[in-house]
Amino acid sequence: MAASYGLIVHQMDVKTSFLSGELEDEIYMDQPDGFVVKGEERKVCKLLKSLYGLKQAPKQWHEKFDRTLTSVGFVVNEADKCVYYRHGGGEGVILCLYVDDILIFGTNMKVIHEVKSFLSKCFDMKDLGEADVILNIKLNKNESGITLSQSHYVEKILSRFGFIDGKSSPTPYDPSVILRKNKNEPTDQLRYSQIIGSLMYLASATRPDISFAVSKLSRFMSNPGIYHWHALERVMRYLCGTMSYGIHYSGHPAVLEGYSDANWISDVDDIKATSGYVFTFGGGAVSWRSCRQTILTRSTMEAELTALDTSTVESEWLRELLMDLPVVEKPVPAILLNCDNQTVIVKVNNSKDNAKSSRHVKRRLKSVRKLRNSGVITVTYIQTDKNLADPFTKGLSSNVIDSASREMGLRPIDVMP
C-alpha cells in the first residue's frame, strides 16, 4: 500500500510497553528478592500498574494504547483492531501496532512528526526513523517501489542447522516424491521440528514459494523418517540458492486480485485434499496460504469448491481492511478471484443446487454465492498454467515455480528493477 500510494514509512518502539497498562482488578504479589522490607516480610505488594508475566498484561496494554489514540481522533480499522488511521485536510496517517513495534505510514513528514511527538509524550518511545527491519523483515525502498526480504533470517537458519554451505536445489519440493507416514522410530524429531518451526515464519512472511513444501512436511513432525528428512533438506538447499529473494511491490496495479486452487487426494496415506490461495496487490503477493482441507471431499470439484470457500473468507477480510482505510480509492471494486475449475464456476453462477451434494458442500457453495451476490468477489476462469495458486497445492517444476514467483513479485534483490 505504501508503494501504491506513495506513503512514507517510519518505525517506533515502545519501551516496557506492558508496564503501561492500567489494571482493572486488585492484584497482589510477593515482595521481590532483594527488596523485602525488614520486619514486614509477611506482607505483599499491591500492583498499581500492569506487570510483565501477568496474563492480562497484553490486553491491558492494548486497551491503554487504544484509548490514547482514539482520544486524538484516530479511528480503529474494523477488520484489524491493531490498525489505526486519521485523515483530514488532504493529509493522512496510518498506524500499525504489533505488541510494542509500531509502523507509521504518512502522506508527508509533517503528519509523521506529529504522531511521533504525541506518542513520545504518552509513552516511553524509541524513534527508529525510516523503517528498516521489523519482525525480522527488512524493508528496502527506492524509486521502483518497496521490497520485503529476509535474507538475513534465511542465512541465520541455514547457519544454525548446518546448511549454509550446502548445494542448491532448483525447487523446494520434488514432485516425483510421495511421502508416507513413518512406521519406524522417529529420526531426530526435535531437530526436524525446530527446522520446520523456523521455516513456518519465513513461509508466511516473505517466501510464498516454500509454503507448500513447509506445509506438507509439517504434517510429519510427530514422527519424521529418513525420507521426510531428505525432503526437508531439499527445502534448505533451495533456500541456499535463493537466499537473496524478496517480494518487490512496484505499486501497480493497486487492485486486489486472488487465485484459488486445490489438489484432490494426492497422498496415499491422507485422503484429504490440499487447498491453496494467493492474493496480489501493488505488484506483489500480500496474502497466501497452503493447507490441508479439514473435510473429506468426493471429487475434484468439491475439493476446488472447498478451496474457493477458504479463499473467499480471506477476500472478504482483505476488502474490509481496504475499505476502512482513507487512502484507498472508493468504492473498492469486487475482488477478482481466479479459479481453474469451470465446473465450480458454473455451480457458483447457477442458483440451483444439486440434490446429491453433501451438506458441507452446499454450505460452502452458499457462502461463495452470498459474497458474489453482495459484490465482494467475482469468480472467473483462469488456465491452470497461469493460476498463481497452483504452486501452493503440489510440487512443480522449476520453470513453473520461477514463473509463478515472478508474478508474485518474488525475485532476487540484486536484480530488482
Predicted regions and their residues:
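Cytochrome P450 core scaffold surrounding the K-helix E-X-X-R motif
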Residues: 18-23, 27, 267-271, 288-291, ...
